A protein has these predicted regions:
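Structured, charged N-terminal subsegments at the starts of enzyme catalytic cores
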Residues: 50-135, 139-143, 150
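Well-ordered, non-membrane alpha-helical segments in soluble/globular domains
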Residues: 56-70, 100-115, 144-160, 193-202, ...
Length: 492
C-alpha cells in the first residue's frame, strides 16, 4: 500500500462560494469528477473521498478520471500520487441503503480493470486505484469485518467459482483485483469513539492487519455534545488508540474530519499550522468544501502544503482522561439543555440554508438528521449555518458550564479551544436572543474568556436575517444567510 495520505479532500457541502467548475447552485454528478482532478492537480491534495453516504455517487469515477485527464494521471498515478477512497453507507444502521455498499464493493474490480487498461496503454505498471473503503457511524468491529470478508469472499473470491461446465468466473470475465481491501472505520458517536481502541484492536486481530487507518469525526460530535466536548472526546480517543497500538504492536494512522467553522474543527488554510499543532497525533486531515472554495486559490494551496509538510503522527501527550470526561459530561449536558430550547427555531431556519451538494435525506439516531436528546436536528452543516445566520456561534453553547478549574485544565490540555472560541465570537450578535429563547447572560459567559473585535459586516448580515425572519420575508432571510456565509468564508 502507498504511504498514508496527509490531506483528504471531501465533499462536505460547507462552502459559501460555488467553485468555478459548477454551473448551478449545487455540486453534483460530473462536477465531482472535475473536482477530483482539480483538488489533486491544482490544490495538491493526495487523497479524495468519493462519497456515497447520503448522496448519489458515480461508480465510474475511476474510468472517467483516467479517460478525461490521461496526461495528468500518467504522471500522478491514481492510487499512488492521488488516492481515491470510497465512503459508503453502514448496513447496520442504514438498512434502506445497505445494498448500495455491496454495489460499491462490486465496482472496485471494474475500476481496477479500467486502471490496468490505462496502464497497459501508457506502458505503465498497474496500480490499484482504490485501496480502502470508509464505513461511517461504526459502533463495533463486526461492521468492519463483514465488509472486508464480503469483499474477499464474495467479490474477489467469486473468481475461483465454477460458472458452467467447469469454467470459472475468472476464466469467463477475467480476474478480480485487488484481492482484498482495507476498511476505515469512521467513528462519530461518543461511546464508540471512546471505544475506538477496542474496535480497532478487534478488527486488526480478526483480519491480521499490521496497520489500520481510523477516522475520528469532529463535526457530528460537536453537534451532539458541543464543541469543547468534541475536542476532548477526540483527544481521549487518540490517547487510547496509541496506547492500544503500543500494547498490541500495530500501527494506527488517525484521520480527523474537521471543517472550517470553529464549531466543526476550525480547519482553514490560515489555521493549518495551528490545527496540526493541536492534533499532532493525527496523520490525515480532511479539507472540506469551504476550505477549498471560500479562500483564494494560492492561500488554499499554501494551507494544503503546510498540512502535508507538518510532522504528524506523534504519540499523544498524556491526558487526565477522567478529568477530561468530567468536563465532557458537564458541558454536554449544558449544551443539550440549550439545544432543547432552540431546536424548533433552528429547524425553521435550516429550511433557508442553501444546498451545496445533491443529497438524500434520511432520519435516524445517527442518520442524516441528527438527534440531541429528544430533538431531531438538521445535519451539522445546516445546523451550524442556521445558528450563525442569526449571530449565535454554536461554539458558545454549553461553554457557560466551564468552571475556572476547567479553564485551567483546557489551557494546559487543549489550548486550541480558546482559538476556536475567539474565532467564533467575532460573529456573535446579541440580538440572536430575539429569535432564540436563550438566556443572554449564559450565552455571553464564554465571551469573557477571550478578547475579540466583532465583525461589523457580519453583524449587519445577521441583523438582516433576524429582521426578515421576524416579518416572514423568506427571500431576505436567504439573502442574509448567503451574505453572512460569504463574509465568514464558510456556510456552516
Amino acid at each position: 500500500m502507498p504511504d498514508v495520505p496527509r490531506v483528504m479532500s471531501t465533499q462536505h457541502p460547507d462552502n459559501a462560494t460555488l467553485p468555478f467548475f459548477t454551473a448551478g447552485e449545487v455540486i453534483e454528478g460530473e462536477d465531482e469528477i472535475q473536482e477530483a482532478y482539480y483538488v489533486s492537480s491544482h490544490l495538491g491534495c493526495d487523497e479524495g473521498m468519493w462519497d456515497f453516504e447520503g448522496k448519489e455517487g458515480d461508480n465510474y469515477a475511476v474510468k472517467k478520471l483516467l479517460s478525461r485527464y490521461d496526461d495528468y494521471f500518467t504522471d500522478c498515478r491514481l492510487g499512488e500520487g492521488f488516492r481515491l477512497t470510497i465512503r459508503g453507507p453502514n448496513p447496520a444502521l442504514e438498512a434502506s441503503e445497505a445494498k448500495i455498499l455491496l454495489e460499491i464493493l462490486e465496482s472496485i474490480p471494474r475500476s481496477y480493470d479500467a486502471a490496468a487498461l490505462f496502464a497497459d496503454e501508457h506502458g505503465l505498471e498497474s496500480v490499484s486505484p482504490i485501496h480502502e473503503v470508509i464505513v461511517p457511524m461504526v459502533t463495533d468491529a463486526d461492521q468492519l469485518n463483514a465488509v472486508e470478508e464480503y469483499y474477499r469472499s464474495f467479490v474477489a473470491g467469486k473468481g475461483s467459482r465454477s460458472v458452467w461446465n467447469g469454467r470459472t468466473v475468472e476464466e469467463w470475465v477475467g480476474p478480480f483485483e485487488p484481492a482484498e481491501i482495507a476498511v476505515i472505520p469512521l467513528i462519530e458517536e461518543r461511546e464508540a469513539m471512546l471505544r475506538a481502541d477496542e474496535i480497532v484492536r478487534e478488527y486488526a486481530t480478526a483480519q491480521d492487519r499490521e496497520s489500520v487507518r481510523v477516522f475520528l469525526a469532529r463535526s457530528d460530535p460537536a453537534l451532539n455534545y458541543g464543541s469543547v466536548a468534541a475536542d476532548l472526546i477526540n483527544k481521549v480517543a487518540l490517547a487510547r488508540l496509541y496506547r492500544m497500538a503500543d500494547d498490541v504492536g500495530i500501527d494506527v494512522h488517525p484521520i480527523l474530519g474537521a471543517g472550517s467553522a470553529p464549531f466543526r474543527g476550525n480547519l482553514t488554510p490560515e489555521r493549518a499550522d495551528a490545527t496540526t499543532a493541536a492534533y499532532p497525533e493525527v496523520e490525515t486531515f480532511t479539507v472540506q468544501s469551504a476550505f477549498k472554495y471560500d479562500n483564494p486559490v494560492e492561500t488554499v494551496r499554501e494551507g494544503i502544503d503546510r498540512l502535508k509538510r507538518a510532522e504528524l503522527g506523534a504519540p499523544p501527550e498524556p491526558i487526565d482522561e477522567d478529568r477530561a470526561l468530567e468536563i465532557v459530561d458537564r458541558t454536554a449536558a449544558a449544551y443539550a439543555d440549550q439545544v432543547d430550547v432552540i431546536a424548533p427555531t433552528v429547524n425553521r431556519l435550516s429550511a433557508y440554508v442553501p444546498d451545496r451538494r445533491a443529497r438524500k435525506l434520511h432520519v435516524g439516531l445517527f442518520g442524516y438528521s441528527r438527534e440531541v436528546g429528544e430533538n431531531a436536528l438538521p445535519r451539522a452543516i445546516g445546523y451550524t449555518a442556521s445558528l450563525y445566520a442569526v449571530g449565535c456561534p454554536p461554539t458558545l453553547l454549553g461553554a457557560h458550564a466551564l468552571t475556572d478549574d476547567d479553564v485551567t485544565f483546557l489551557e494546559g490540555t487543549f489550548p486550541a479551544f480558546f482559538d476556536h472560541l475567539r474565532d467564533a465570537a467575532r460573529y456573535y450578535n446579541p440580538r440572536c436572543t430575539d429569535v432564540l429563547d436563550l438566556e443572554r447572560a449564559r450565552l455571553e459567559t464564554p465571551l469573557e474568556l477571550v478578547d475579540v473585535e466583532p465583525d461589523d459586516g457580519h453583524r449587519e448580515a445577521t441583523d438582516e436575517v433576524i429582521d426578515a425572519f421576524d416579518r416572514g420575508d423568506e427571500e431576505a432571510v436567504r439573502s442574509g444567510i448567503r451574505r453572512g456565509a460569504r463574509r465568514r468564508r464558510f456556510l456552516g
